[in-house]
């Protein structure tokens, strides 16, 4: 079973802009956003 590797391989072929947006979105979910940058993607706002 290698689902993680399969998904990682799929992401390598994404458009760099889309991949960057996915990383930014994941970071927003992990931690609080700064007050001036807060939007619906932040969990602690």
From Swiss-Prot:
Cystine residue pairs: 32-44, 33-42, 38-45
Residue numbers covered by the propeptide annotation in the UniProt entry: 1-31
UniProt keywords, alphabetically: Disulfide bond, Secreted, Toxin
Localization: Secreted
Signal peptide span: none
GO annotations of cellular component type: extracellular region
Major location (coarse): secreted
Top-rank lineage group of the source organism: Eukaryota
Keyword hit for Disulfide bond: yes
Tissue expression pattern: Expressed by the venom duct.
Secreted recorded as keyword: yes
Record GO terms (molecular function): toxin activity
Similarity remark: Belongs to the conotoxin M superfamily.
Domain statement: The cysteine framework is III (CC-C-C-CC).
Protein name: Conotoxin reg3.12
Source organism per UniProt: Conus regius
């Amino acid at each position: 079973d290698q689902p993680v590797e399969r998904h990682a391989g799929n992401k390598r072929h994404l458009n760099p802009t889309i991949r960057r947006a996915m990383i930014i979105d994941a970071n927003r979910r992990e931690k609080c956003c700064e007050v001036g940058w807060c939007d619906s993607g932040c969990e602690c706002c």
